[in-house]
């Protein structure tokens, strides 16, 4: 498979793309046409072409920071660089980097210092995600991770700390606020905000009644309007407004973090790793499965859009129809993300060389065919590709078990 990866990377290098291999020097900016990226100050075009990285032998979910081994990481980055990878996306974890809401852990930051130095030497730039749950869930995420003031203040502190520490660092391509954020359907503490949002939208109860008609009960007022049931119901105005309210909460979550980052680090790009059902094509029968993070809304605060995609409309190799349907789905999702800013396919891929849990066995050649098909199908609608994951992961419970660019023993597929 990696003959194809190396070939594609070689083509990018010949096409005037910022250097493949060698130490990282200049920072990356959005190009003047808003369609891609350039290296500063050279002006060379930069196409992020790489993978999502974690050490494949640190368990599942991977404990990349608790079991951090700089020698192993350096070996992995050397392999990636040799394959033509110029970008790696890496998760930061809340329980390791910020177990206490009031401070960011210095020991964890020193590990990140070491990883950034490795990346800089290898020529592989980094997309670093905001604090996630892989190594545990901190107490301050409760009761409300996305709209609770305690959790939001912790995020403010996290980004101000990292922004100040790594401002201007050329090895960092971008900050990714969070991997695949997804709002819950309802949190009890949202009730006052829901009432205020409705009042701002409709101004008077008469206007709300006119819009909702019989859906609004006589006893309901701004402070007592109930959220809808998590049940699909076409043309239900309460359900529509609730989804718009959830999007509003997601807007505020994105805006606040971006402002915290910009205050201490105006030098790096910012994005969000959107889950693919941020575009509500699948799972429409269950309203809560809509993530409420909408790239067409939240892109106003971001420098580029980062969308994730896996083949959910049937398995690609079960039929030509499933193959074609999934590629059309990919193109549709990416086209939806176009708002005048670059679009990166931040996770994609499939598996080969075995059979993950509950999935049929596929060969490495079949994995290669699908990855190449995804790249070819998306070339007109995206400007970067990061496969999932770097290496086959023995303890994985999903396609990551055989989804790597390399095998678990680090030999090339």
Pin down the residues of each PLM region.
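Active-site neighborhood of phospho(di)ester-bond hydrolases with catalytic His/Asp-centered motifs
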Residues: 273, 344-347
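Bacterial N-terminal signal peptides that target proteins for export
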Residues: 1-6
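Active-site mouth of glycoside hydrolases
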Residues: 27-302, 314, 352-355, 362, ...
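Active-site flanking residues adjacent to catalytic metal/cofactor-binding acidic residues
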Residues: 175, 179, 307, 346-347
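Bacterial N-terminal signal peptides
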Residues: 7-16
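Boundary at the C-terminal end of the N-terminal hydrophobic targeting segment
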Residues: 18-20
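Surface-exposed substrate-engagement region within the catalytic domains
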Residues: 335, 360-379
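Substrate-binding surface in catalytic domains of secreted glycosidases
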Residues: 188-192, 313-332
């Amino acid at each position: 498979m990696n003959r194809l990866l190396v070939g594609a990377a070689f083509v990018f290098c010949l096409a005037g793309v910022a250097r493949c291999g060698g130490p990282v020097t200049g920072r990356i900016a959005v190009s003047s046409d808003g369609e891609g990226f350039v290296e500063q100050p050279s002006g060379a075009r930069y196409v992020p072409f790489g993978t999502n990285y974690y050490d494949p032998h640190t368990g599942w979910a991977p404990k990349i920071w608790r079991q951090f081994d700089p020698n192993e990481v350096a070996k992995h980055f050397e392999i990636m660089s040799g394959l033509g990878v110029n970008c790696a996306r890496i998760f930061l974890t809340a329980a390791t980097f910020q177990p206490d809401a009031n401070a960011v852990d210095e020991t964890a930051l020193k590990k990140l210092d070491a990883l950034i130095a490795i990346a800089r030497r290898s020529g592989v730039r980094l997309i670093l995600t905001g604090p996630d749950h892989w190594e545990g869930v901190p107490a301050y995420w409760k009761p409300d991770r996305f709209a609770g003031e305690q959790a939001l203040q912790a995020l403010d502190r996290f980004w101000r700390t990292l922004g100040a520490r790594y401002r201007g660092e050329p090895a960092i391509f971008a900050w990714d606020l969070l991997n695949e954020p997804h709002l819950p359907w309802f949190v009890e503490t949202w009730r006052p905000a829901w009432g205020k949002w409705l009042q701002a939208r409709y101004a008077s109860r008469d206007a709300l009644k006119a819009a909702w008609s019989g859906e609004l009960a006589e006893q309901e007022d701004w402070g007592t309007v109930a959220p809808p049931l998590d049940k699909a119901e076409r043309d239900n105005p309460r359900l529509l407004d609730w989804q718009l309210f959830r999007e509003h909460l997601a807007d505020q979550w994105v805006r606040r973090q971006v402002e915290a980052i910009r205050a201490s680090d105006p030098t790096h790009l910012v994005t969000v790793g959107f889950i693919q059902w941020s575009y509500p094509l699948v799972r429409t029968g269950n309203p809560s499965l809509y993530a409420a993070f909408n790239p067409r809304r939240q892109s106003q605060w971001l420098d580029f859009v980062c969308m994730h995609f896996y083949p959910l409309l049937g398995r690609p190799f079960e039929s030509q129809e499933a193959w074609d349907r999934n590629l059309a789905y990919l193109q549709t999702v990416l086209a939806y993300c176009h708002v005048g800013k670059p679009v990166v396919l931040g996770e994609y891929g499939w598996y080969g060389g075995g059979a993950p849990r509950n999935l049929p066995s596929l060969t490495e050649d079949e994995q290669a065919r699908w990855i190449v098909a995804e790249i070819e199908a998306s070339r007109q609608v995206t400007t970067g590709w990061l496969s999932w994951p770097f290496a086959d992961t023995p303890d994985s419970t999903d396609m990551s078990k055989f989804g790597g660019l390399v095998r678990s023993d680090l030999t090339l597929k």
